[in-house]
């Protein structure tokens, strides 16, 4: 129970302290190759809030979560830019 509480506190602190907005970089990409060794339903994404925008115009919590959707959609969803959509 203490572990869960600690993780929730860490997530909340990360969310609140994410004060800098990331600018978009048109040439930036996301490399999902490291996640291909896991089943799509079991990709171990970290609990950090560094938002990225997918080509479906959904803001994902971080690049790992976007990669999960990219792999789930067989590449139909792509990385658009860093930051919120």
Curated annotation (Swiss-Prot):
Q: Which UniProt keywords apply?
A: Disulfide bond, Protease inhibitor, Secreted, Serine protease inhibitor, Signal
Q: Please give the SUPFAM superfamilies that the UniProt record associates with this protein.
A: Kazal-type serine protease inhibitors
Question: So which residues are the signal peptide here?
Answer: 1-19
Q: Which GO terms describe its cellular component?
A: extracellular space
UniProt GO BP: inflammatory response; negative regulation of cytokine production involved in inflammatory response
Disulfide bridge map: 32-67, 45-64, 53-85
Q: Where is this site: Reactive bond?
A: 47-48
The reply on keyword Signal is yes
Protein name in the entry: Serine protease inhibitor Kazal-type 7
Source organism per UniProt: Mus musculus
Gene coding for it: Spink7
